[in-house]
Protein backbone atom coordinates (compact mmCIF):
# COMPACT_ATOMS: atom_id res chain seq x y z
CA UNK A 1 0.00 0.00 0.00
CA UNK A 2 1.16 3.56 -0.60
CA UNK A 3 3.75 4.70 1.91
CA UNK A 4 4.06 1.35 3.73
CA UNK A 5 7.67 0.68 2.70
CA UNK A 6 8.74 4.23 3.51
CA UNK A 7 7.04 4.04 6.92
CA UNK A 8 8.79 0.75 7.69
CA UNK A 9 12.19 2.16 6.67
CA UNK A 10 11.77 5.33 8.73
CA UNK A 11 10.59 3.33 11.74
CA UNK A 12 13.55 0.93 11.42
CA UNK A 13 15.98 3.85 11.23
CA UNK A 14 14.49 5.64 14.23
CA UNK A 15 13.87 2.69 16.56
CA UNK A 16 16.33 0.06 15.31
CA UNK A 17 13.67 -2.59 14.74
CA UNK A 18 10.86 -3.40 12.35
CA UNK A 19 7.49 -1.80 13.11
CA UNK A 20 4.82 -3.92 14.76
CA UNK A 21 1.24 -4.12 13.55
CA UNK A 22 0.28 -1.82 16.41
CA UNK A 23 2.86 0.80 15.40
CA UNK A 24 1.62 0.81 11.81
CA UNK A 25 -2.03 0.93 12.87
CA UNK A 26 -1.38 3.81 15.28
CA UNK A 27 0.55 5.75 12.64
CA UNK A 28 -2.17 5.21 10.03
CA UNK A 29 -4.90 6.27 12.48
CA UNK A 30 -3.14 9.48 13.46
CA UNK A 31 -2.34 10.36 9.84
CA UNK A 32 -6.00 9.90 8.89
CA UNK A 33 -7.22 11.93 11.85
CA UNK A 34 -4.59 14.64 11.31
CA UNK A 35 -5.38 15.04 7.62
CA UNK A 36 -9.10 15.24 8.33
CA UNK A 37 -8.71 17.68 11.25
CA UNK A 38 -6.50 19.93 9.11
CA UNK A 39 -9.37 20.21 6.61
CA UNK A 40 -12.23 20.60 9.09
CA UNK A 41 -10.64 22.72 11.80
CA UNK A 42 -11.91 22.67 15.39
CA UNK A 43 -15.54 21.91 14.50
CA UNK A 44 -16.28 18.46 15.99
CA UNK A 45 -19.39 17.91 13.87
CA UNK A 46 -17.51 18.66 10.65
CA UNK A 47 -14.72 16.30 11.75
CA UNK A 48 -17.18 13.52 12.57
CA UNK A 49 -19.11 14.01 9.32
CA UNK A 50 -15.90 13.99 7.28
CA UNK A 51 -14.70 10.79 8.95
CA UNK A 52 -18.09 9.16 8.35
CA UNK A 53 -18.36 10.12 4.69
CA UNK A 54 -14.88 9.92 3.19
CA UNK A 55 -12.40 7.16 2.37
CA UNK A 56 -8.61 7.01 2.47
CA UNK A 57 -5.79 4.81 1.26
CA UNK A 58 -2.71 4.62 3.44
CA UNK A 59 -0.07 2.28 4.81
CA UNK A 60 -2.71 -0.12 6.21
CA UNK A 61 -4.79 -0.18 3.03
CA UNK A 62 -8.17 1.33 2.30
CA UNK A 63 -10.18 2.93 5.11
CA UNK A 64 -13.91 3.64 4.88
CA UNK A 65 -16.10 3.75 7.98
CA UNK A 66 -19.47 2.07 7.55
CA UNK A 67 -22.21 0.24 9.41
CA UNK A 68 -22.59 -3.52 8.89
CA UNK A 69 -23.74 -6.63 10.76
CA UNK A 70 -24.98 -4.57 13.72
CA UNK A 71 -21.69 -2.69 14.12
CA UNK A 72 -21.46 1.05 13.54
CA UNK A 73 -18.69 3.14 11.99
CA UNK A 74 -16.30 0.25 11.45
CA UNK A 75 -13.53 0.02 8.87
CA UNK A 76 -14.66 -3.04 6.94
CA UNK A 77 -11.72 -4.09 4.82
CA UNK A 78 -10.12 -7.17 3.35
CA UNK A 79 -7.54 -8.81 5.54
CA UNK A 80 -4.29 -9.85 3.91
CA UNK A 81 -3.38 -13.52 4.35
CA UNK A 82 0.34 -14.27 4.37
CA UNK A 83 1.88 -17.68 3.78
CA UNK A 84 5.55 -18.63 3.97
CA UNK A 85 6.66 -20.17 0.69
CA UNK A 86 10.28 -21.15 0.05
CA UNK A 87 11.37 -19.21 3.13
CA UNK A 88 9.68 -15.94 2.17
CA UNK A 89 6.40 -14.41 3.35
CA UNK A 90 4.00 -13.99 0.44
CA UNK A 91 0.52 -12.45 0.24
CA UNK A 92 -1.90 -15.15 -0.97
CA UNK A 93 -5.23 -13.36 -0.29
CA UNK A 94 -7.12 -11.23 -1.30
CA UNK A 95 -6.77 -11.95 -5.01
CA UNK A 96 -6.26 -8.25 -5.78
CA UNK A 97 -3.08 -8.23 -3.64
CA UNK A 98 -1.93 -11.85 -4.00
CA UNK A 99 1.64 -12.41 -5.18
CA UNK A 100 1.22 -16.21 -5.28
CA UNK A 101 -1.45 -18.89 -4.93
CA UNK A 102 -1.92 -20.45 -1.52
CA UNK A 103 -0.30 -23.84 -1.04
CA UNK A 104 -2.96 -26.18 0.32
CA UNK A 105 -3.01 -28.59 1.94
CA UNK A 106 -0.12 -27.52 4.14
CA UNK A 107 2.95 -29.48 3.00
CA UNK A 108 4.42 -29.77 6.51
CA UNK A 109 7.49 -28.30 8.14
CA UNK A 110 10.95 -29.23 6.89
Question: What is each PLM-predicted segment?
Answer:
Residues 1-110:
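Extracytosolic ligand-binding ectodomains
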Amino acid sequence: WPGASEFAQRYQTKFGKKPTYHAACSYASMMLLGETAAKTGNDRKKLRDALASQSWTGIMGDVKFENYDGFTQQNKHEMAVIQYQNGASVVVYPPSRAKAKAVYPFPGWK
